[in-house]
Amino acid sequence: MAKNQDESKEKRKNLVLSRFRWSEQWRRPWDDKWLRWYKTFRGIVPKLPEGEEDRSNLHIPYTYSTVDAVRSKLLTACFANRPYVSFVPKDADDVENAKNMETLVDSQMNRTDVEFMVRMYTLITDMLIYGGCPYEVGWRYELRKIKRKVPMVDESGILLGYEEQEIEVVNWDDPDFQPFMIDDLYPDPEGTSIDDCSWVIRRRYITRKELEAKIDEGIYKVKDLEAINQAGDRISEGKQDRLAAIGAADAYADEADVGGRRYELLEMWEDDRVTTVINRTEVIRDEENPFWHGKKPFGFAKFDPLNGEFYGISLVEVIEHLQAELNTTRNQRIDATSQTINRMWIVLKGMGLEPADLVSRPNGIIWVDSMEEVPKEVEFKPPDPAAYQEESIIKADIQEATSTYNEARGAPSDTKRTATENAIRERATNIRFETKLRIFEALGLKRLGFFYDQLNQQFIDDIRSIRISGEDGGYEWQEMRPEDIAGRFEYQPAGSSIEPTLDKLEYRTNLLNLYNEFKEDPEIKTLELKKRVFEAFGIKDTEKLIKSEEEIMQEQQEELAAQGELQAMLAGGGGLLPGMGGGMY
């Protein structure tokens, strides 16, 4: 039996390694592109040839400013409102549970120790640089030992002092969202998306301490740790290649240079199975997919998807050659200007002049035997004014390709336009951003909501006390049981739309005037009109702010009942309120 298990693991190991090599070979052209785009984003330029070190070799950070403009707009639009993801019930019985799940997920995404925004920031950054960014969502359970001071009292209750005690608490028992480098994702070359791939391999690196912790938890089963150690140390190749490209690390560093021993894990996920190979020598995990949702626990956010292709188009890819042209144009202009500033001379051989004699100095004198032997200055023409116009054309091309005009960057416009022209231009720009926003919401936030939902329903098996913000600005606590979050839901990102800034104020003002004009009109549905007003201010979850017709009717009935009680009290007390008589107090 043991022999059959060993043979089965050997087959699985060979399958993982063969698929890894296949994906690695297929992905190689993208590896070169990713490194090139990373260097463009970081502003890394090749060194000048020997003897030409005095030439200008600048990188103009226009790619960075373009990425930053798009990144800021996407991040602001997606996370303008909380909760970031709304849960919509599929069945009528799940309305209340959808609200509970929404509250739970919102609290999990906004834990003070989660740094959700930082992770989203890095995800969007990588997506813009490389065209996509993979992320993994699993369940994380973590215990932590903390020290506390406990009061010590005697039998009579007198405080004697404090004793230091060490206790173990649950530090994390929630979903864990982790973006990771695109270099560490090896997809099925035949697939076009995570779900479409028959398998996906994630490469990761862990320390010995992390490995031993997983062994203790029973997740990994190691047969021969010594053989694994002898297989050699591993380094994060993609990360080291990037750092080496900017001169920040040695791509061939040994273990001492990267902080100690690392173990490479090749984790192959199929919809129904997961297999992990360590240091390409031994299978340490081979089991059924532990997640109820039955999917690979990955997502892949794309900036610009292409039909039939796994990787999309990168923002840096679009402007890469324009950035190179911008660098060349600026450096050529600087070199030309330097030539006009740094004067050169034509001097006959044998005149006895030294180069130092031709250096400009106060009251300087150049001695010659004849005026015919006067050194002649070499004249260089200053750069043509058209060279400055060329840079503006290049920047305009970049702005047109990425829809990041000066107004979107917070810079003044180069051209004077009328207010109408600016409004039309901004609407067209925002339509393009809105499209990119919808793609990111579909591939990022909706899938993230799906994972959080499914993992919560699977792993929460006790009563949870959720901290929520109260109406008075304080905090309230809401208890939730597993049955309170069960159900089938759909996911709707709650971010605000990207509105034109030039005409939105006028639109809102007109809408408010319209509301004031018709709010008392019996033929107008006032609630629907109120929704339009809220939506004009970018608020989507209007149902949380506007009372339903049922709630309004109930309040009216309660008010009528209260008035009836008051009238009855007045009638029974002779028209006076209780406690009031005709005398003096």
Tell me what each language-model feature is.
Residues 69-70:
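Basic/charged alpha-beta structural segments of nucleotide/phosphate-handling enzymes
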